[in-house]
Swiss-Prot record:
Required for both pre-rRNA processing and heterochromatic gene silencing. The keyword Nucleus applies. Component of the RIX1 complex, composed of ipi1, rix1/ipi2 and crb3/ipi3 in a 1:2:2 stoichiometry. The complex interacts (via rix1) with mdn1 (via its hexameric AAA ATPase ring) and the pre-60S ribosome particles. Interacts with rix1, gcr3 and Las1. This is Pre-rRNA-processing protein crb3/ipi3. The gene is crb3. The lineage of its organism: Eukaryota, Fungi, Dikarya, Ascomycota, Taphrinomycotina.
């Protein structure tokens, strides 16, 4: 069963609820009261719903087995964005001062906090493998932080905050970043999507930090989401929803009006061409597959279902609509809130709606202490060599080795050596074959 969690902004101090619907039938499954979800400040773990309050330093916790508020935790300062790791071990939070907090969800200990940006943080995203944390802010920059470095006990207690350095820096946007998405799969082969108030969407290669494509939009985006196969980017703005295909086979994106890419086909099968690339700037309407669906109210948030067959939108009037991603028609309206929709999330994992006292959420500490070093909670941080793989100098070194070793004379020498080795292998094979034939004939004569 695929569930949809949705919520709206709190108005005039009145708390709002988060509703849980069956995405495919529209049936109301559960209600989580007084959660007051804020945009980019609400997330879920395996057993809990977390929502940070924008008006006070407080984090509301809901157990999926209870409809009422489970607990409220007082925080060091007001959080404007939160995100939990896919493994359920870490909670990252950003503040208006640009501070980044890292808590352990196993013990509640404050592991680390430091000044990550000079301006307020807007969005936090973990990679799908949980190895890297991406932070975006009003300054238009995105930093990638290695989790194993942020939560390492040695770096926490034996070094200063200034020693923590991002493994990648994505810069180029001129204004605040309003939405950010990470492509599926391992982080070393993933892509990063950022939407900014400068009316552009930028697609980055995570491992190298290079800009792949810039998509120019007709107006300022308010939200963005990408389907799990990275085929289409959905953008919401004040006029409606924009479908932007990342691959096209009929009328492709071009760098200018006169130049058009040819459609490649093999056996009457069209091979899709990726838009942009090599840092090119393309316009959203350069493809026939792209389109704008007008809506009566400005779009505030978007998400897609597990198989990308459904697109779910929330607007300023409080409508939560389910769209068919192929026909681009509205299938149903799940709910209408009294304020703008601020939170949408699809969950495929089975959620237990039965109360369980053993699933209590730990109290988040407000200060860094060494108490958790002596606790019984131990987390093994696996070193997959992500930091080394994502270093640009390594890639440049590999490229230089290919260039230096790829001269014509060296390739000719390698080809001659391979040919001689092949001839020698054939000669030995024929000798061995003759010996085997002689032994076989001798055996038959007995």
């Amino acid at each position: 069963m695929e569930l949809l969690l949705s919520g709206c902004e709190a108005i005039e101090g009145e708390p709002s609820n988060v509703l849980c619907h069956n995405l495919h039938t529209g049936t109301l499954v559960s209600t989580f009261r007084q959660s007051s979800p804020a945009k980019n400040a609400t997330c879920t773990t395996l057993n809990h719903l977390l929502s940070a309050q924008h008006t006070r330093p407080q984090l509301n916790i809901h157990n999926f087995g209870k409809e009422i508020l489970d607990q409220s935790i007082i925080l060091p300062e007001i959080l404007i964005c939160v995100q939990s790791s896919p493994c359920g071990s870490w909670l990252a939070a950003g503040t208006e001062k640009g501070n980044l907090y890292i808590w352990s969800l196993k013990s509640g200990a404050l592991i680390y906090f430091f000044r990550a940006h000079y301006q307020p943080l807007t969005i936090l995203k973990f990679s799908n493998d949980g190895m890297v944390l991406f932070t975006a802010s009003n300054d238009g920059d995105v930093f990638a932080w290695l989790i194993s470095t942020l939560v390492d006990q040695n770096s926490t207690f034996e070094t200063s905050n200034s020693s923590v350095k991002a493994i990648s820096h994505f810069s180029g946007h001129k204004r605040s970043i309003v939405s950010m998405e990470i492509g599926p799969g391992p982080i070393v082969s993933g892509r990063l999507y950022t939407a900014s108030e400068d009316n552009t969407i930028r697609i980055w290669d995570v491992s190298t930090g290079n800009l792949l494509t810039t998509i120019a939009l007709p107006s300022t985006p308010s939200c963005m989401t990408v389907d799990p196969s990275e085929r289409v980017v959905y953008v919401g703005n004040e006029k409606g929803i924009i479908w932007i295909p990342l691959y096209t086979g009929s009328s492709t994106f071009s760098n200018n009006v006169k130049e058009k890419k040819r459609v490649t086909s093999v056996d009457n099968t069209t091979i899709p061409n990726a838009i942009g690339g090599m840092g090119r700037v393309v316009d959203y309407n350069d493809s026939r597959e792209s389109s704008i669906i007008s809506c009566q109210s400005p779009i505030t948030t978007l998400t897609v279902s597990f198989d990308a067959s459904l697109l779910i939108s929330g607007d300023k009037d409080g409508n939560v609509l389910v769209w068919d991603s192929v026909s681009r028609q509205v299938l149903r309206r799940l709910v209408q809130y009294y304020s703008p929709v601020s939170f949408l999330q699809c969950k495929v994992d089975k959620i237990s709606f039965y109360s369980n006292s053993s699933l209590s959420f730990p109290v988040l500490k407000r200060m860094i202490t060494n108490e958790y070093l002596n606790s019984d909670v131990r987390i093994c941080i696996q070193d997959d060599g992500v930091e080394q793989l994502m270093q640009p100098e390594n890639i440049l070194k590999i490229s230089s080795d290919i260039v230096t070793q790829g001269s014509e004379s060296s390739w000719r020498a390698k080809a001659e050596t391979s040919e001689m080795q092949l001839k020698e292998a054939k000669r030995l094979f024929y000798e061995l074959k003759q010996i085997h034939q002689a032994l076989w004939e001798k055996y038959l004569q007995k």
